[in-house]
């Protein structure tokens, strides 16, 4: 077991007591690490999930302010999670959680638009890119 991780693969990095919780759903450690490096501001508490199925359940429990999802995550995919959240939000606007999608190619931006995400960033991304996308998503 890695330091800071429990058996379920979740890691909590609390950066401030009154921080906005950002959920990061990615099965690749480098993607989660890059998002963490970009969001080291004291304004954010980051919650990681490497399994999209357990992450979907945790969204209701954790109620994050925003979610960052890798497009290619496990066998489910970030698109399916984003679509599920978007459809749920259409039924109950109060439950809408903005999503930032991490894309593999710029050409995938049409997928992000179709999923109804608040913002997207194409890999490889800079810290500035991901910070700007998350701030944009939180402002919606």
How does the language model describe each region?
Residues 25-26, 49, 67, 102:
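Conserved sequence signature across two-component system core domains
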Residues 43-51, 58:
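Short hydrophobic/Thr-rich beta-strand motif most characteristic of the beta2 strand and flanking loop
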Residues 80, 101-121:
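Alpha4 helix (beta4-alpha4-beta5 surface) of REC/receiver domains from two-component response regulators
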Residues 19-30, 35-39:
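Conserved acidic segment of CheY-like receiver
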Residues 135-140:
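The C-terminal output helix
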Residues 69-88:
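Conserved phosphotransfer microenvironments
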Residues 90-98:
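His-Asp phosphorelay/catalytic-motif detector in bacterial-type signaling
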Residues 125-134:
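C-terminal output helix
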